[in-house]
């Protein structure tokens, strides 16, 4: 896919992997990029301004992907302001940190939120954007996780791993449902150095990184720009690729 003239939407795009994707797309030549956020208004607006100053039209839109009405309103605003949508990156996600062995702590409320955001949220965005994407032979990239591929030891919770596995399967289903006009692919990143991860581990974060890195053949964890690069590669270099999941894990799944 050539990016000149294209418009992209990145959910959960204010920072971390999402923010890196926004910057990659802007540098690669899209004409417009929309940054979706739920709570990170300051970060999203600052990033939109950064992208505008780089010469690419940008806006930040608040929308909770758990709310179908808000998702539809977001897509309608994109249609009104940009006239098109070519690329959807379903990056928004949520987890709760619950030991895999602690089944009692994994409540129905936790299950419901994790599945609603990580799976149904991606579906809502794809459904709302489908007609715009079909109009210009567009592309969807879903952001899953290595937790949806490997053993429970990689999971923040059993519900999160299950949801990310479901997102991989949703990718296959959407690839069939939206063919031949829209390609749908997925990335499954391993441990990535993001504010989300550092915020969870706090003072122990550097120690956690060191311990985790020892288990990777590349002897380190990922940075957001590396995941964004893989996503960009699927968008620009995979015109005959659909329904696939690219594992971006520094070789972790080999060990």
Locate predicted features:
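C-terminal substrate-recognition "lid" of short-chain dehydrogenase/reductases
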Residues: 2, 126, 220-248, 253
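Conserved glycine-rich cofactor-binding loop
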Residues: 14-15
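Conserved glycine-rich Rossmann-like NAD(P)H-binding loop of the short-chain dehydrogenase/reductase
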Residues: 30-46
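The beta1-alpha1 cofactor-binding region of Rossmann-like NAD(H)/NADP(H)-dependent oxidoreductases
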Residues: 41-42, 62-74, 108, 225
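Catalytic loop of short-chain dehydrogenase/reductase
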Residues: 94-95, 108, 139-166, 171-179, ...
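Substrate-binding pocket helix/loop in short-chain dehydrogenase/reductase
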Residues: 99-103, 107-112, 208, 212
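A glycine/serine/threonine-rich, flexible loop-to-helix segment
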Residues: 154-156, 191-216
